[in-house]
Design a protein with these regions (language model features):
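Non-catalytic scaffold segments within catalytic domains of secreted glycoside hydrolases
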Residues: 1-116
Length: 116
């Protein structure tokens, strides 16, 4: 692939609808780990764009899908961080995957908000 398309890699609109935020932290971590493996294999990621910062409108389902790292109250418009934002912040602020974080998310039965 690299000879045909170059080594540049852009990951866009990468996220999961998870209304109760039970699996999003593991999802984020597993995709960050895949980016690390891509780097180790010689690809050069140019960007990773999580979908989405806030809950939003999805054409087929309206406001039922919950992709946001931040929950949006549709009445008051208040935005509250979901527990998985802690995992996203940990990875992005360090620009790395902390080994302890990996163990916690992969092997823990606790909700993601209780991990950090």
């Amino acid at each position: 692939m690299a000879s045909k398309y170059s080594n540049a890699l852009y990951v866009t609109e990468n996220g999961t609808s998870d209304p109760r935020d039970l699996n999003r932290a593991s999802y984020i971590l597993s995709h960050a780990y895949a980016m690390l493996k891509a780097i180790e294999s010689g690809l050069t990621p140019r960007g990773y764009f999580h979908w989405s910062i806030n809950d939003n409108y999805e054409w087929p389902q309206g406001f039922k899908q919950k992709f946001g790292l931040f929950e949006v109250d549709l009445i008051t418009k208040e935005r509250k961080p979901r527990p998985s934002t802690k995992v996203f912040k940990e990875i992005t602020s360090r620009n790395a995957i902390n080994g302890d974080l990996l163990k916690l998310v992969v092997f823990s039965e606790k909700p993601p908000g209780e991990l950090i």
